[in-house]
Each structure stands twice: as structure tokens, then as C-alpha cells.
């Protein structure tokens, strides 16, 4: 327990018999409960978990292999039932041993202090850096960082880090039926939390890599995740325009994005665009300039929506 919060850890595991025991046995003492989800393992993971049946703080779930997103969601929902009348923080920690348990206290600290509702681990700002991270992962993380920043309306430098801490307030409002469970799960959470007006903080976590290899096919991954982020980005802005959370920033961002698309699509233009093109400025440049302006307004809208949510919450308590 930390402050007024019980601490739960969600550990998704699929074929992790080589690493899972160490992950469980090195959990910090302040952890009140750990939910280990065996997601269709074909090795000895399930047998290993039987060694912890007598433990009061280790709980296990068995899934048929629904994927890591579904496993994490199941763990969050288990904690909601376990502590339905208590304040708690749910930490996601992979079962592959690539997350340092010593970083957990830094991860939950911003929530305990009341500075945010969600904390994301950031391997790029850790003192040890990301020297252990494979080069292709660094490049992929940088690209996805840009896309996630644009889609969420706030700066995100390590979107793919799965080491996170979530306040129970978020979990009690989350739409579990519509929750994204495929590739891009952490990106979806950031974008959707921005849409709901929750504050996101970042905490340094160590980059640890062993002998594990990823089975992700890069091109299909980028296509699927990129498409999801583009769709969720537009859904986020449209939902604000159609709700009582509309702000001047949102309107200006929508106008700027519209100008950008108008410059890019043939047969659609404005007098200003025709004048700029006539002066030798390429339509693509106009598009990216308009989108850059839109992103600035979008970030302002994101901050305003967060303030509106906090003000509404304060009025409810008054």
C-alpha cells in the first residue's frame, strides 16, 4: 500500500516459465495483490503458477490465448472486483522479466501525489539510457512516438513501453466492451485517455532486454497501428466538437486540419491556397504547415479538456 492507495500488479504471461518466477518473487513489499494471467501458454507456465496457490497476494487467471491486451484488461477488471470499494492503483508489469520492479515506486508516485491519473514508463529518459534496446526498436519507437504525439495531442516519447500505472478512477469509467485489444494497445490507451481528459505523466524506467525475440511483423504492425491511431485521433476531435467539451482550440485545430486536407486533395482549394500555390509554394508544404498549426491548437485543447474535467470533479465534491 502507498498513501491511501492499495497497489495491484497485472502480469500478463504467455510461455514465460523461464522468467515468471523471478518476476513474481521480486515484487516490492508494498504490492497488495498481483494478478497473473496465463494467456494460453503451451510451456510450463501454468504448472509454475501452481506453486503460488497458497500465497494470499498472488491471484491467477487462465485465458485461452486472447492476446496481451485482453489479458491486461482481464487483470484490471479482476482488481475492480477485488477492491470495488477501495482506492487503488493498477500497475501493468510484463511476465518476461524486462521490467525492473525497483522502478515501480517511481511509476506510482505521481498518482499517489495527485498529479495525474495515469503514468507511463519512459525508457528513453532513464539514467541508464536505451543502450540495451535493439536499433530497429529505437527507430520504431521514435516513429510511433511522433504518431502517438499527434494522435493524442500531448508529448509521448516512449509509447510502446508497457510498464504503466493506472488510477482506479480510470478503470471504473473505462468502456471494456470497446477497449482495443490488438497491436497498438498502449497507443490506444494514451489517445483515449486524452479524449476523456485524464492527466498523463511519465516516469523513467530501465530498459532491459534478454534473449527474447519478437514475433511481430513490422509492416502489418505499422499499418494496423497507424490506421487505428489516425481513426482514434479524428474520433477524439469530433467527439469534443459534438460535446460540451468544445473549446476554441478544438475549433481552430479543426479549421487548420481542414485547410491541410483541402490543400492536399485535388480539386479542393481556397483563395489563400491558390494564392500561395501561385507564388510557388507546394501544396504539400501548405498541408504540413496547416497540420503543424492544428497540432499546436490540438495540444491546447487537450490541456483545456483536462482542466474542464478537474473543474467538474471539484464542483461535484463541493
Give residue spans per PLM region.
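Cell-envelope/extracellular polymer assembly enzymes that use nucleotide-activated donors
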Residues: 6-8, 33, 188
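Acidic helix N-cap motif at the loop->helix transition within catalytic regions
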Residues: 18-22, 43-52
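Short, well-formed alpha-helical segments that are part of the catalytic scaffolds
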Residues: 14-30
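Hydrophobic helical membrane-anchoring modules
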Residues: 1-3, 180, 184-318
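Short beta-strand/loop segment that forms part of the nucleotide-sugar
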Residues: 11, 32-41, 61-64
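Donor nucleotide-sugar binding loop of glycosyltransferases
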Residues: 16-19, 41, 68, 100
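A conserved acidic beta->alpha catalytic loop
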Residues: 38-47, 97
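Acceptor/aglycone-binding surface of glycosyltransferases and processive sugar-polymer synthases
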Residues: 61-78, 89-92, 101-183, 209-220
